[in-house]
Amino acid sequence: MPQQKMKRVKTTITVNGETREVEIEVPDIEAAWGDPQNMRWLGKRIARVEGAEKVTGRAKYTNDVQLPGMLYAKILRSPYPHARIRSIDASQAERLPGVRAVITDLTREPKYVGEEVAAVAAVSEQVARDALKRIHVEYEPLPFVVTPETAREPSAPRVHGGQNVSGGNPRERGDVDSAFRRNDVVVHEATYSVPARSHCCLEPHGLVCQWQGDHLIAWASTQGIFSVRDELAGALGIPASNVRVICEHMGGGFGSKFGARAEGIICARLAKMAGAPVKLMLDREEEHLATGYGPGVTAKVKIAATRDGQLVAWESESYGTGGIGGGSGVPLPYIYPVPHVRTRHYDIATNVGASTALRAPGHPQASFIMESAMDDLAHQLGMDPLEFRMKNDPNPVRQAEYRLGAERIGWHRRNRIAGQAPGVVKRGLGVASAVWGGGGGAGSRPTVRIDPDGSVEVRLGTQDLGTGTRTYVAAIVAEELGLDIRQVKALIGDTDYGYSGASGGSTTTASVAPAVKMAAMAARERLVAVLSQQMQVNPADIVLADGKVTVRGSSERSLTWKQACALLGKEGIEVHGEWNANLQGSGVAGCQFAEVEVDTETGKVRVVKIVAVQDCGLVLNRLAVESQIIGGVLQGVSMALFEQRLFDEQTGRMLNANLEEYKLPGSLDVPDIEAIVYDNPTGKVSGMGEPPVIPTAAAIGNAVFNAIGRRIHSLPITPAKVLQALGKV
């Protein structure tokens, strides 16, 4: 087989839990995606390659894993928001028939309702639940605080022993005070608030763990199979090479499923103790209490612009809580360049479980705060809020998106004076914008293999959250080799495949797709090199298309794909790909327009339509991009009108830790959503899972303001808040 030119590149790998930089050899190939107009698969609306498996029930999720002799685990959780454990007696649980393992050393001082205290593995879920009731725990309740407003008080109970309030260091540029004192500016001041929200993944967190000697196999619902592997290895004190993690399919993560977490380590420990495989799946209450949430934020804002609408100054003081963790910060001011800025943000510790990333962490909160302030200031200036944005937004992609979205929503129909719509049920229009990174990075190392029988597979240890990774991986290889997408088998979700990073931050596509493209190009080059020798033609004259191999200028000389692959001999072709920065882009832009109806007698808000215009660079699968936009908008509608975690300050308990009182939109709440994919001619791929959720709530809030002429300063926008704003309650 002809020798291929190679080059050495640096990449990051993880071995036994340790991350380090190494040099590897990869094919030396010029990289470009090519002209989208000439592509058969990429950029088109491609049905999911695993779609039939999912709709017929053949797709295997974590809860579908069934192993011989498998046990079922349950976790005993603290009923107190803060307590000291004086004693634990698990003897009655251990004697219960069917119980195989019990753990009681998980914590001595739980700091939130729902923290893990003990766990059992038994022959059935019912036996495991009964065993939990037989574990007797003596608690000493301790002082606690569950709301950031109370936790800020000097007399509030200390969550970690020290101060509850951290941060607050000013971030400043320009001369803020002088800018606000200028005679030619209009100043707006207000306070805006966004509550914490649960992830509410369709599939709950869970694992199945099975030991084979000193090797562990874990089936996990996770956004990062290698993250789970490394975390389990570290916690169990074994080499990472002894841990295999599998995630064939999963039902969403939204930022909450990056590691093994407590339940993963508990599951593995119980399986080791019991000498049998163990399944541990969390229920909906546990999902709310112990798997994280997106933190809320409250911001006191001061914003100024000249009378002709040029932004001049921004000042904000904000606070939020990540529970017993941190990370409630938001990127303020958001999107629009402001020359004079001063911000302070405070993290407030509370006796609530630790927050985690939630789709576009911090950005939906920042968007609601910034875009509400922008509309309010535009109202004071007497300017069209869209004109005000376009005057202050230098991004050329968003400028084009504004024009496109305004046309599609019929922006000319908006109330020129907010609240002046006739009738009891008033209509209004609003707009808001988004920005996201969407770039990727090195680390993914896929393998493409072509066998002599014509079968083609691509293997990579990434995972598909439901976003369509498996489909575009197959499409990239099919495009490069001139095959039908059904001729390419995409194998992902297993740490036995090549390394790939966690799926989050909209980085997966921009990290995985370039590496798969490089592997597919290398496979094509190797194949063409062999065929050119066998067919005695110039490699440049060989054409791979429509599942055939032809020679340019000689139509009678053609081979079927199987005939061509048979010429490879017994070895076949197996090549690896490495990330190429020339194939990925970053900095995706988007905007959304909302139309709402507000019943001024009941206070009910109905979202009539959302027009969402989103950029993502080179589109790999248009159908998947449209689906991501629609899904993001629905989460944004939910954030705007429904979601809020409610706590009882007297008991520290979450009052709506279920899917009955924790409100989510139903089918009747879904508006008409027009998803517009803005084709940005960069020729490079970017991620876009996050940005569609960012501006929705802000656009809806601004539409409500346009309808009734009153600002709802906090989410969710409930009927009670609307009626209060109208002075009717």
Short names for language-model regions:
Residues Q223, G438-E457:
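Active-site-adjacent "gating/activation" loops or surface patches in catalytic cores
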Residues H249, G253-G275, K279-L282, R470-I476:
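Thiamine diphosphate
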Residues P2-E231, P337, N351, S355, ...:
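Extended, polar/acidic
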Residues P277, R284-V341:
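Active-site cavity-forming subdomains of large catalytic enzyme subunits
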Residues A131-R134, A220, R229-E231, F254-A260, ...:
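Short acidic, glycine/serine/threonine-rich loops at helix termini
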Residues A73, L216-A220, S455-L460, V607-K609:
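Short, aliphatic-rich beta-strand segments
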Residues P2-V9, E18, R95-L96, G237-R244, ...:
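C-terminal catalytic domains of large/alpha subunits in multi-subunit enzymes
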